[in-house]
Regions:
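Membrane-embedded catalytic scaffold of the fatty acid hydroxylase/desaturase
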Residues: 77-212
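Hydrophobic alpha-helical transmembrane segments
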Residues: 2-12, 55-68, 85-92
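Residue-level micro-sites within transmembrane alpha helices that shape
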Residues: 34, 68-71, 75, 100, ...
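Conserved small/polar residues in nucleotide/adenosyl-binding loops
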Residues: 216-224
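Long, highly hydrophobic alpha-helical transmembrane signal-anchor segments
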Residues: 23-61, 119-129
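Cytosolic-side membrane-entry/anchor segment at the start of a transmembrane helix
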Residues: 1-36
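Membrane-embedded alpha-helical segments that form the functional core of polytopic membrane enzymes
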Residues: 54-74, 84, 139-149
Length: 224
């Protein structure tokens, strides 16, 4: 689809039910406050109860952070930008990510809301534990910390100017994704995988159009 104009002010209404609508909003403080203590406890529990070497745990932990960057790219490209003729999938795509492209500066929807995020990370821990057993207690904290850092970077990109000059390419890459071509520039916390998979913008040549944006999600944002 193509939005005739994106809205740099305002907020999409996803549900008519006020309770459900409230569950679609979050903040950096809520996300860090909820998840960071869980990550610390999880890592400590794994260390104390499984007696894994601390060096091994940190290798798994930092490996998980790197794996998050790959997951971030794949999820953004193939799940958040899902294209389908199915109305339910269209609706899912708009709730998950399409509303953010429609209202990119809505700060209340730059972080995943607390309730959905807790459900998702609990399911992820279960999957990690089934696959890697005790190593999940190091992998899970690294993976979720990667998500928190990504979400914080995403929030900063939409809420403020880059604090350091070397970070400007990240800002430009994501702004081009929103305001120029949403089929490129899927990396948010980094551009490594965009370079690997050939979806990197030429930052020296491209200029974003802040009034219109090509967006291939099918329109399905009517409220329930």
């Amino acid at each position: 689809m193509k939005f005739d104009k994106i809205n740099n002010k305002g907020q999409a209404q996803l549900f008519e039910n006020k309770f459900l609508e409230a569950l679609t909003k979050g903040s950096p403080q809520l996300s860090w406050g909820i998840h960071l203590p869980i990550l610390i406890f999880c890592f400590y529990y794994g260390y104390k109860n499984y007696q894994m070497p601390l060096g091994t745990m940190f290798m798994v932990f930092f490996g998980a952070i790197f794996f998050w960057t790959f997951f971030e790219y794949i999820a953004h490209r193939y799940i958040f930008h899902l294209i389908s003729e199915n109305p339910k999938l269209q609706r899912f795509a708009y709730i998950m990510h399409g509303n953010h492209h429609h209202y990119p500066r809505d700060r209340q929807r730059l972080f995943m809301p607390p309730v959905p995020s807790l459900i998702i990370v609990a399911a992820l821990f279960g999957i990690f534990y089934l696959v890697m057993r005790e190593y999940a207690f190091a992998f899970y904290p690294g993976f979720v910390l990667g998500w928190l850092m990504y979400a914080s970077m995403h929030y900063m990109i939409h809420a403020m100017a880059p604090p350091f000059k070397f970070m400007k390419p990240l800002w430009r890459n994501h702004h081009l994704h929103h305001y120029k071509d949403e089929t490129l520039g899927f990396g948010v916390s980094n551009t490594f995988w965009d370079k690997v998979f050939g979806t990197m913008f030429d930052l020296k040549k491209e200029k974003e159009d802040k009034e219109t944006v090509s967006y291939t999600h099918l329109r399905a944002h009517e409220t329930l």
